[in-house]
């Protein structure tokens, strides 16, 4: 079929936009034709828009990697600037942190934080917990049956049955614990499992499906699955359960900044930083009724690194849960962050794309760790926490010194 006919039929809605890759067996050609269909469609006809004449690029991209994995109805790709902060010394290693952002001053500020941290010997960071969660809703005919199911899940015998079914779903998924809450005759079951180097949402969802089938075969035939996700997980929304129980990687990172580095690099004082952190990040956040937001701007750094490394940017909602603490220790500044729900992976999702894969490689965490599955994803979580630590340190310093507006005018406003 001639391209002109494909475009005409697509414009009239007789060929679905989503079917072009399958029909043409050529992802790049499908993108090219879809751009023309969108340009000629009545939805864009009255706004003088053409994708061919637009600044949105489409050539020179690996759409085969995108197909069936990352995006649908593709008309191009969105270039976002990528900068590097650092290198920063973390657990004895020097690493650059890639950050993809359009916010001027963010990379420069984080880089300044890295410099100050290195002056004190670097960051020490630990993974305190590692478990992705999924929480389906199941429904029973009566409250009594829901209660019996909750009790069974909490028993050794019940857990072993569920564990066997769950673990059989994957080489890497390993069930850690189950927490069930009954609301009337509905049961919300929060499964927690390790998922290797994958972020793990798809993996754990598959395991949960098999676990629920096992439940139905072991005395709970009347159980109906209302939804595989019941928001007790909780994914992509603020939730106390993630702050308290953790989700993904639970990480803490700490550094000591010598007084001279605080004064010379950060242009402030230890006393001013400690006071500002209490007033802003602790008291101010409490006044605001913050949930997991006891920090200055953790989400800025988390999202920038996520975009650069192929993570799910929407998961910055829970991944940015951060408690920032600053103390005066013998005249120097001790700063730490506690992040209970960093959700990252080094395989799957956007990590299959070439540019994102390259940034993971630069950080030394690309792909699956063949010797210790999960180690690369844990290392990435530590690097995210180190970046957040640097970002918190620099922004709070700018606020305490009164230089925030000046720095943004310098880095975020084009002259002339």
UniProtKB/Swiss-Prot annotation:
An annotated GO cellular component: endoplasmic reticulum membrane
- Look up keyword Glycoprotein and say if it applies: yes
One example of the protein's molecular function in GO is: hydroxymethylglutaryl-CoA reductase (NADPH) activity
Q: Which GO terms describe its biological process?
A: coenzyme A metabolic process; ergosterol biosynthetic process; isoprenoid biosynthetic process; secondary metabolic process
Q: Which reaction does it catalyse?
A: (R)-mevalonate + 2 NADP(+) + CoA = (3S)-3-hydroxy-3-methylglutaryl-CoA + 2 NADPH + 2 H(+)
Q: Which residues form the active site?
A: 103 (charge relay system), 236 (charge relay system), 312 (charge relay system), 408 (proton donor)
Top-level taxon of origin: Eukaryota
What pathway is this protein said to act in by its record? Metabolic intermediate biosynthesis; (R)-mevalonate biosynthesis; (R)-mevalonate from acetyl-CoA: step 3/3
What is this protein's function?
3-hydroxy-3-methylglutaryl coenzyme A reductase; part of the gene cluster that mediates the biosynthesis of the diterpene ent-pimara-8(14),15-diene (PD). Within the cluster, the HMG-CoA reductase AN1593 functions in the mevalonate pathway, which produces isoprenoid precursors. The geranylgeranyl pyrophosphate (GGPP) synthase AN1592 is needed in the formation of GGPP, the precursor for diterpenes. Lastly, the pimaradiene synthase pbcA performs the 2 cyclization steps that convert GGPP to ent-pimara-8(14),15-diene.
> What is this protein's name?
3-hydroxy-3-methylglutaryl coenzyme A reductase AN1593
Q: To which species is this protein native?
A: Emericella nidulans (strain FGSC A4 / ATCC 38163 / CBS 112.46 / NRRL 194 / M139) (Aspergillus nidulans)
Tell me the lineage of the source organism. Answer: Eukaryota, Fungi, Dikarya, Ascomycota, Pezizomycotina
């Amino acid at each position: 079929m001639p391209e002109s006919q494909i475009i005409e039929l697509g414009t009239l809605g007789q060929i679905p936009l989503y079917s072009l890759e399958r029909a043409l067996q050529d992802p790049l050609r499908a993108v090219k034709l879809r751009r023309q269909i969108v340009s000629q469609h009545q939805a864009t006809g009255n706004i003088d828009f053409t994708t061919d004449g637009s600044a949105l690029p489409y050539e020179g991209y690996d759409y085969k990697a995108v197909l069936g994995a990352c995006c649908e109805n593709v008309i191009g790709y969105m270039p976002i600037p990528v900068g590097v902060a650092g290198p920063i010394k973390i657990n004895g290693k020097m690493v650059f942190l890639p950050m993809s952002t359009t916010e001027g001053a963010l990379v420069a500020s984080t880089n300044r934080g890295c410099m100050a941290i290195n002056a004190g010997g670097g960051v020490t960071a630990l993974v305190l917990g590692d478990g992705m969660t999924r929480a389906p809703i199941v429904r029973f005919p009566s409250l009594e049956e829901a209660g019996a199911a909750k009790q069974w899940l909490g028993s050794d015998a019940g857990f072993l049955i569920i564990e066997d079914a769950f673990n059989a779903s994957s080489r890497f998924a390993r069930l850690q614990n189950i927490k069930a809450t009954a609301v009337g005759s509905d049961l919300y079951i929060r499964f927690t499992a390790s998922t290797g180097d994958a972020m793990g949402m798809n993996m754990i969802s598959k395991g949960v499906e098999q676990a629920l089938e096992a439940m139905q075969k072991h005395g709970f035939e009347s159980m109906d699955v209302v939804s595989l996700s019941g928001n007790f997980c909780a994914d992509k929304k603020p939730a106390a359960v993630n702050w308290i129980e953790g989700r993904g990687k639970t990480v803490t990172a700490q550094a000591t900044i010598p007084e001279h580095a605080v004064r010379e690099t950060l242009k402030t004082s230890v006393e001013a930083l400690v006071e500002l952190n209490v007033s802003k990040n602790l008291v101010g956040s409490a006044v605001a009724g913050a949930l997991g937001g006891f920090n200055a701007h953790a989400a800025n750094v988390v999202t920038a690194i996520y975009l650069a490394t192929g993570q799910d940017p929407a998961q910055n909602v829970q991944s940015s849960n951060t408690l920032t603490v600053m103390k005066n220790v013998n005249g120097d500044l001790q700063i730490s962050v506690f992040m209970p729900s960093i959700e990252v992976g080094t395989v799957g999702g956007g990590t299959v794309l070439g540019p994102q894969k390259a940034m993971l490689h630069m950080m030394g965490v690309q792909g699956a760790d063949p010797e210790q599955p999960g180690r690369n994803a844990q290392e990435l979580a530590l690097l995210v926490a180190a970046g957040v630590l640097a970002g918190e340190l620099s922004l709070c310093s700018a606020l305490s010194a009164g230089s925030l507006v000046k720095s943004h005018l310098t880095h975020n406003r084009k002259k002339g």
